[in-house]
Amino acid sequence: MATLLRSLALFKRNKDKPPITSGSGGAIRGIKHIIIVPIPGDSSITTRSRLLDRLVRLIGNPDVSGPKLTGALIGILSLFVESPGQLIQRITDDPDVSIRLLEVVQSDQSQSGLTFASRGTNMEDEADQYFSHDDPISSDQSRFGWFENKEISDIEVQDPEGFNMILGTILAQIWVLLAKAVTAPDTAADSELRRWIKYTQQRRVVGEFRLERKWLDVVRNIIAEDLSLRRFMVALILDIKRTPGNKPRIAEMICDIDTYIVEAGLASFILTIKFGIETMYPALGLHEFAGELSTLESLMNLYQQMGKPAPYMVNLENSIQNKFSAGSYPLLWSYAMGVGVELENSMGGLNFGRSYFDPAYFRLGQEMVRRSAGKVSSTLASELGITAEDARLVSEIAMHTTEDKISRAVGPRQAQVSFLQGDQSENELPRLGGKEDRRVKQSRGEARESYRETGPSRASDARAAHLPTGTPLDIDTASESSQDPQDSRRSAEPLLRLQAMAGISEEQGSDTDTPTVYNDRNLLD
């Protein structure tokens, strides 16, 4: 048996290992397409600011698409460094594209004010054609979808400080788009606006240079579609992180935005570790979790073996990302989500509508948190030097805090309906007093009579018909238990029926001598 277990552990490790690049096989290269990236040909701030202005207009032009957009974005992303050409050549290793650098200098003979650097050849016409200045109609279109402040006609400046502020403002808006361009583009606008407000308050960006929504939508779409652009952005982030010493202000801002980009698309894996394993609840000892715990251990080792690009595997479209999906450990993931919605309010808005979601283990996680409230881990207490008296004090305080949280209905709405608790007893009903209290007592008596005459099903309807409207009923998450036949009386359908019956009985008034009993068929009619 010991040999079998060792073989199993070795099999799991080898199964999840990334492929090793060895053997006599040659490198597989795809059919490359050429991307032209304009870069400044001198160190003049005027050249850089004019190039930035022309590239922003070029991206806003609806007639421009494909590799030309990608080259323009790479040119903007590399403008903050002293030598953009060296940076691009150093970090670019893409098997799908071939990047051609095109140096740009000032020119008084072209409509765009720029020309391509060449030896003895006039390239003004080619520069105007590239920057879409050869057609007046196209030039007008390039201004559409630019800045929200229409009073800004251009962003050409001559001092380095002003240029860095404008460039940093534009780069911040571009980098924020990478956070959800691939994983959640439909809900990205709200989070992008929060990031913009944050950096505006920190004076990292200038509010007047807020780009229009249409311009941002174009950039978000090209980021989502173009893998080569995302590879360049991830390579640039990793290169900035490797830079020793103090970094430029724009580089520090990019690292700050990276906290929203890193581990995008890996929420299931990260949250399962956080709430399923790190909480160290005794439920981890279940036999059902043994295999998935071994799988998760192998995935954590694989994550470390992948190195620095591991947190960006979804943005890089790495095929190994499928191993980290929640479908590889569905029971442990469902349990971790139940723990999460009880511990953190932010987890209440997560969507659990997956085919492999198991409501039984979700409720296990919820109940594990509720019943373990106020308990102190003996192992952790011994490591921290906590005495038994201190542990009792902490447990007492934690229990009062938990009760206060439940009484104020604080937390995610998933936590307000228990799937494992029984029905509320008569002594636990809220005291209403006066006429309403008498009505509740009357309904209880009628319910007992109805139980003796018609059986438990009709009696339950009689009790529901006179439930006071002040009783809180939360049905937002009751649908999660509808898949379990044993919990059908606590599912969304009975709760909806109770609420509807309470409304009907309230309309009849308090002077009714013989209250009417409504069943399911009455409500459906």
From Swiss-Prot:
Residues 1-403 are annotated as: Ncore. Residues 1-375 are annotated as: RNA packaging and organization of the helical nucleocapsid. Phosphorylation at Thr-279 is required for the formation of the nucleocapsid. Residues 418-525 are annotated as: Disordered. The keyword RNA-binding applies. A motif (Nuclear localization signal) lies at residues 70-77. Transmembrane segments: none annotated. Residues 404-525 are annotated as: Ntail. Residues 477-505 are annotated as: Interaction with the phosphoprotein. Homomultimer; forms the nucleocapsid. Binds to viral genomic RNA. N0 interacts (via Ncore) with the phosphoprotein (via N-terminus); this interaction allows P to chaperon N0 to avoid N polymerization and non-specific RNA binding before encapsidation. Interacts as N-RNA template (via the Ntail) with the phosphoprotein (via C-terminus XD); this interaction maintains the P/L complex anchored to the nucleocapsid template during the sequential transcription. Ncore is globular and carries regions required for N self-assembly and RNA-binding. Ntail is an intrinsically disordered monomeric domain in the C-terminus. This is Nucleoprotein. It comes from Measles virus (strain Edmonston). The lineage of its organism: Viruses, Riboviria, Orthornavirae, Negarnaviricota, Haploviricotina. The gene is N.
